[in-house]
């Protein structure tokens, strides 16, 4: 290769590297934004799950009390 071809090839490689660097920063910014959005969604889902846990426990407690009342009625009927 002569010197001119080497310079042209070097310029093309350098230009490609610079363009790739710019697009990578934009992609990194987009990915960072996506991660923040997903983190917020995970936090919201975690809060929803915690709220459901307390609702489920309340429903279990109500069911246990209802079963106890039924057991008491059945034992009174059998006496």
UniProtKB/Swiss-Prot annotation:
<keyword id="KW-0572">Peptidoglycan-anchor</keyword>
<feature type="lipid moiety-binding region" description="S-diacylglycerol cysteine">
    <location>
        <position position="22"/>
    </location>
</feature>
<dbReference type="Pfam" id="PF04728">
    <property type="entry name" value="LPP"/>
</dbReference>
<keyword id="KW-0134">Cell wall</keyword>
<comment type="function">
    <text>A highly abundant outer membrane lipoprotein that controls the distance between the inner and outer membranes. The only protein known to be covalently linked to the peptidoglycan network (PGN). Also non-covalently binds the PGN. The link between the cell outer membrane and PGN contributes to maintenance of the structural and functional integrity of the cell envelope, and maintains the correct distance between the PGN and the outer membrane.</text>
</comment>
<feature type="modified residue" description="N6-murein peptidoglycan lysine">
    <location>
        <position position="79"/>
    </location>
</feature>
<dbReference type="GO" id="GO:0008289">
    <property type="term" value="F:lipid binding"/>
</dbReference>
<keyword id="KW-0449">Lipoprotein</keyword>
<protein>
    <recommendedName>
        <fullName>Major outer membrane lipoprotein Lpp 2</fullName>
    </recommendedName>
</protein>
<feature type="region of interest" description="Disordered">
    <location>
        <begin position="60"/>
        <end position="79"/>
    </location>
</feature>
<keyword id="KW-0677">Repeat</keyword>
<feature type="repeat">
    <location>
        <begin position="25"/>
        <end position="35"/>
    </location>
</feature>
<keyword id="KW-0732">Signal</keyword>
<feature type="lipid moiety-binding region" description="N-palmitoyl cysteine">
    <location>
        <position position="22"/>
    </location>
</feature>
<keyword id="KW-0175">Coiled coil</keyword>
<dbReference type="GO" id="GO:0030258">
    <property type="term" value="P:lipid modification"/>
</dbReference>
<dbReference type="GO" id="GO:0043580">
    <property type="term" value="P:periplasmic space organization"/>
</dbReference>
<dbReference type="InterPro" id="IPR006817">
    <property type="entry name" value="Lipoprotein_leucine-zipper_dom"/>
</dbReference>
<keyword id="KW-0472">Membrane</keyword>
<keyword id="KW-0564">Palmitate</keyword>
<keyword id="KW-0998">Cell outer membrane</keyword>
<dbReference type="InterPro" id="IPR016367">
    <property type="entry name" value="MOM_Lpp"/>
</dbReference>
<feature type="signal peptide">
    <location>
        <begin position="1"/>
        <end position="21"/>
    </location>
</feature>
<feature type="coiled-coil region">
    <location>
        <begin position="28"/>
        <end position="76"/>
    </location>
</feature>
<comment type="similarity">
    <text>Belongs to the Lpp family.</text>
</comment>
<dbReference type="GO" id="GO:0042834">
    <property type="term" value="F:peptidoglycan binding"/>
</dbReference>
<dbReference type="GO" id="GO:0005576">
    <property type="term" value="C:extracellular region"/>
</dbReference>
<dbReference type="GO" id="GO:0009279">
    <property type="term" value="C:cell outer membrane"/>
</dbReference>
<feature type="repeat">
    <location>
        <begin position="39"/>
        <end position="49"/>
    </location>
</feature>
<comment type="subunit">
    <text>Homotrimer.</text>
</comment>
<keyword id="KW-0964">Secreted</keyword>
């Amino acid at each position: 290769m002569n010197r001119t071809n080497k310079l042209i090839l070097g310029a093309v490689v350098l230009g490609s590297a610079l363009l790739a660097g710019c697009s990578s920063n934009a992609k990194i910014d987009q990915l960072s934004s996506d991660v923040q959005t997903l983190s917020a969604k995970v936090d919201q889902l975690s809060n929803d799950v915690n709220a459901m846990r307390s609702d489920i426990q309340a429903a279990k407690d109500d069911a246990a009390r209802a079963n106890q009342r039924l057991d008491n009625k059945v034992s009174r009927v059998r006496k």
